[in-house]
Amino acid sequence: MSPSTATFIPTRNPAPALPVVEQSRESRAATFMIAAALLDYPGQEWDDILTEVASTLAQLPAEAAAEFSQFLDWAGERSRREVEEAYVETFDQKRRCCLELTYYATGDTRQRGIALTIVRDLYAAVGWQLDNDQLPDYLPNILELAARTEGEEHELVESMLASHREGIEILHAALLSLSSPWAHVVAALRMALPEVCLLY
C-alpha cells in the first residue's frame, strides 16, 4: 500500500513543529482516552464527558492540558446540539477530516480492504471486541485501545498508531486549515504519539 494512492485533499497550512513533551505511561494513556472521547460523536453523555475531562487535565503535561482546555472552552460555550452540528460538518462532510485512518494510506481503493483486515487482526490479537458500529480503523476506537492495553499488547497498538502517524498529521493540518476546535484535541494527541513508522 502506498500513501500516493490516497485521495485526500492536501492543505496549505502545515502543522507546527511538535514541542518536546516528556510523558509518563499514565499521562499518555489519559491523553489517548481524552482524545478518544472528544473525537467521538458528541452523544447524550457529552456534558458528563466534558466534566470528566476537565477533572483529568491535571494528570497531563501542561502543553497537552492547554490544548485540551482550549477545546473545552469552545465546547462549554455551546449546546450539545451545536457541537453535534459542528462535528457532522467537520468529520462527516469533509473527506480530508476523515477519522478512519486507513483512508489516508489507501484512499477509497481495493487496498483499503487489506488495510482494514490488518487492523481487525490487531483487535483479535489483543482480545478486543468493538462495541460500536464504526469501522475498526476509527481513530477514537484505536486510541481507546491504546489507553487500555499494557505490555506487548500495548506495543502492538502503538505500532499501529505509528504506522498511521502520517494520516494523523494530515488530519491535524486539515483541522488547522479549517480553524476547527478539534485541531486542539489532535494537537494534544500528537504530543503522546509514538514516532513515525510507516508500514506501507
Segments predicted by a language model, with ranges:
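A glycine-rich, hydrophobic loop/mini-helix early in the fold
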Residues: 65-125, 129, 133
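Short secondary-structure subsegments characteristic of cysteine-rich extracellular domains
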Residues: 152-175
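Conserved small/polar residues in nucleotide/adenosyl-binding loops
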Residues: 200
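Contiguous, well-ordered alpha-helical segments that form the cores/surfaces of helical PPI scaffolds
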Residues: 33-37, 103, 137-147
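Short, extreme N-terminal leader segments that mark the start of a protein/domain
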Residues: 1-55
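Phosphate-end processing signature that detects enzymes handling 5′-triphosphorylated RNA
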Residues: 122-135, 144-149, 153-156, 180
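Short amphipathic alpha-helical segments and their helix-coil junctions
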Residues: 8-20, 114-128, 167-173
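Eukaryote-biased recognition of C-terminal alpha-helical segments
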Residues: 185-196
